[in-house]
Amino acid sequence: MFRLFISTTARFCQARGLAPALSFAIDCTRAAPWALRWTSFIDRFCQDRFGTAAPLNLIRAGLSRPGGIGRGRRISRLRAHYDVIGAYFAATAATRMVFERAVPMAVVAGEGGCVYQLEVLTPEAHMRDEGELMLALSHAGGTVAALPFRFGYCGGNRLALRLGRMHVAAEAELVETDLYGLPVRSVLMDGVYALARTLGMTEISTELDDNNAFWSDCGATYIPGGRFSLPLEAQFWHSEAGRTALGEAWVPQQMARAEIMSQANAAVGSWLRYDEAAHGRARRPVSVAAVK
């Protein structure tokens, strides 16, 4: 443990300078034993899964306390999140998720010819208290909408998806017009449903926020603790009311949405880690941290 602390501090000093290294050392001292527990876990995880040391920013993430939660709960959440990535995702997708590289999910062209990408990214700094990854809809000009999330467990080894708050840019209405009226929030949720469906999630939940009306449209129900539980399949788009509300825009919009969903489902399926001994089924977690 002490040797790992020394070597990690040296890595900070070499890569970022003396001040960040001292800051890391001080935070580790203040947060012990949580800091050593987290550093040991994530370093072992990266060595076993990728054959390399954990990235410094990821080590640092375990020492923060976003949202005011305790360090123990923060580390439990992180361990569950990376446990799912390590157990379920193939090397290419897992490497991109851990080492902050984009994981493409779907590409769709708007009516005006603009190309939009749905992908999994590392959250921007101001979203790090809401999730360890984020679904993002973007084009050449930047991100239009983003949804932070993290993987977790509920009731033992059942998989769960914990969503953060929807972040939507001011230009969203223009993008929705170009996408035949398809709401950008719904595009992000198609990514959520692709993850939930392919991974066999048993729960999707989110905190109460300023998107409560949208969560209600998705069929969410309130659960104790200030959270919404979402259905595992889209509700609005399967209803006759949804079709009537859209009118003539229904057909081109649904064609665009069907293309996004098809690509997203195929993409997530290609990310999974399969075990031949399990006859093609995705691997189950090696270790389970049951946290909410």
Segments from the language model and where they lie:
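Conserved acetyl-CoA-binding loop-helix of GNAT-fold acetyltransferases
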Residues: 176-194
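Terminal substrate-recognition subdomain of acyl/acetyltransferases
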Residues: 1-159, 166-175, 194-292
